[in-house]
Amino acid sequence: MAAEWGGGVGYSGSGPGRSRWRWSGSVWVRSVLLLLGGLRASATSTPVSLGSSPPCRHHVPSDTEVINKVHLKANHVVKRDVDEHLRIKTVYDKSVEELLPEKKNLVKNKLFPQAISYLEKTFQVRRPAGTILLSRQCATNQYLRKENDPHRYCTGECAAHTKCGPVIVPEEHLQQCRVYRGGKWPHGAVGVPDQEGISDADFVLYVGALATERCSHENIISYAAYCQQEANMDRPIAGYANLCPNMISTQPQEFVGMLSTVKHEVIHALGFSAGLFAFYHDKDGNPLTSRFADGLPPFNYSLGLYQWSDKVVRKVERLWDVRDNKIVRHTVYLLVTPRVVEEARKHFDCPVLEGMELENQGGVGTELNHWEKRLLENEAMTGSHTQNRVLSRITLALMEDTGRQMLSPYCDTLRSNPLQLTCRQDQRAVAVCNLQKFPKPLPQEYQYFDELSGIPAEDLPYYGGSVEIADYCPFSQEFSWHLSGEYQRSSDCRILENQPEIFKNYGAEKYGPHSVCLIQKSAFVMEKCERKLSYPDWGSGCYQVSCSPQGLKVWVQDTSYLCSRAGQVLPVSIQMNGWIHDGNLLCPSCWDFCELCPPETDPPATNLTRALPLDLCSCSSSLVVTLWLLLGNLFPLLAGFLLCIWH
């Protein structure tokens, strides 16, 4: 499968637009058809140019530009795999702030938010448990390391500024300067102590708009790379993306191309780089390339990068058919990591294929850093943009083989009673994971799970998705409600007729053309007098959303709730049909549904104390006592008044 790379980017208006995802069955286009119809013939023909953008020359950063073995606070990498989405913290350089207003708005409020949102949803990581605090560069690029000390010590002085590519790293993201000035250890830290760092992030991306030498000599929109790697798994934790200011276009027709370019470049920084091949790990966390005592692989000075082993990249010779019925030898480099081999064999239906071929043309930066264009044409990580870039399973496999980014191709929540509801991938319908237990073990090739929560290991072969033609791969699936065998409604949020009955609408949901599926953080509760009701099937629901200059708004009844950032918890408390509905919703990304969104911020503090008017059906004991006391005090007065009249 291939995920749409450039389209489906966000929509204006009060409701959601089309899905951000589209799937196609092929990674490349086999032919080009020029369809000419409905046009008046002219005396002259219109020339058609079939070309490609200039090749991507990914600059593998030099040894002096990258800091390895960066010590992070706490145990930054958890050894077990946890299904959590990649979190990228975007930090904009002052050069972005100095762009023309329309370019600045495009970069900060549309281009990078959409690209980052896409990548965060696509990749998962081993969850970190600490704060990213980057190492300082040294003034002379010379440093020492002490045994059993995770820090590095600059010989002489630390650099006045630490850079990530061309972008200066903010001081608050840096560790304290540590120096060695000769003599005996210990030598200590000097200057400003450790700063705050970056919490709740797996990767920090510094975005600049600097007119660098590369911008003046190469016809490029942007370029990106990594700059610091953590000590445990050699994972890039910081990188940069620089936009050439003169190449930033605000023309709507050029946005899709720029968006696909930014995604392509950020993937280079995350792991698809020849400079990182030697740092790939296997599924157990072991390096695929042997290391020296200092923890680093051998350095290849002729290539200017760390030398990978043949467990990652292998050189092979092909027999090459050319003209005059001749066969020549053709040397290629194959990426041979396990998941890449598996996906390449599936894609080309070739069970003996050794790996996926890397590009061998285009010069330094294009060669070895991309897939072979001849084989994967418009795949996202080929070396030039020709048409409609798509991200294939082969690139996803490579990112998983880095040992850091992982993919979760299926859901793992058992379908049971009560149901644990979720959202369909496009967030347009309530869904349920169709994972179930079968009466007999599934065929070996369809047994996907090494573990499932609450399921004994000996029972795992019995579990898979309910749809056989999907290879028993469980996925979140739309469903319908039935009563006594009769169809009632479906879970598609956009269909008004799916609106639940008033007294069954526990979550205060609203179905209609402007509604989307939102995750419920907690089960909704209906309260009235001393009665409390909740529905056992919960986890998601349909709610109306709208776009505003302030951001995405979620509507429950006639009350709007502003989403300041994705993942924000919205405490909901509304009155509907004489009942109080209480619950919590999770905010989606504004970019999932809106064309323009403001920068994400922390929500303002709110007073969550509920002030409700008195309900006529109230069963408050204090109110009952008060009424009886009032009647008791009035009775003697009334009796005296009647006696006076009698006499």
Curated annotation (Swiss-Prot):
The terms under GO molecular function for this entry are:
metal ion binding; metalloendopeptidase activity; peptidase activity
The UniProt entry annotates the active site at 265
User: GO cellular component annotations, sorted alphabetically?
Assistant: cytoplasm; cytosol; focal adhesion; lipid droplet; membrane
Keyword Chloroplast on this protein? no
Q: Which InterPro entries match?
A: Peptidase_M8 (IPR001577)
A GO BP entry is: cell division
Per the record, the similarity remark reads: Belongs to the peptidase M8 family.
This protein is called Leishmanolysin-like peptidase
Give the organism the record lists: Homo sapiens
Q: Which gene encodes it?
A: LMLN
